[in-house]
Amino acid sequence: MGGHGAMWNAIRHKDIFGGAGTTSGGMDIRPFPKNWEMSKQLGDYDSNKEVWDNHTVINLIDGLENGDLAIIIDCGESDFFLKVNQNLHHRLLEKKIDHDFVTRPGAHNGQYWNNSIDYQILFFDKFFKK
């Protein structure tokens, strides 16, 4: 859950981080309650919906304002996380928060990530040169 963790930390600590990026990240963990042993940390989803709601990136967006973070979201068109990334993109658009949203052919695998890293580096190179 690296992409979720990166965004989670950056949004919660925007006073420390100026930018955040995710490639194939699970931006909303709620559709996947039986995966990655998350219920060990958050409890059973059906019994702890509020806890899950409070621990998913897409709901942290409400605490962001445009300009708080430079954000890049990148996800393959065949990735099982595509829908939650698209949902995050739409939430950011609704809040008028500038961000880069990239989708290309590819899945949740090393081949996609090896290609994606070039876009992430370009994004952060530009960010750090400001």
Description of each model-found segment:
Residues M1-K130:
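Non-catalytic cap/lid and distal C-terminal segments of serine-dependent acyl enzymes
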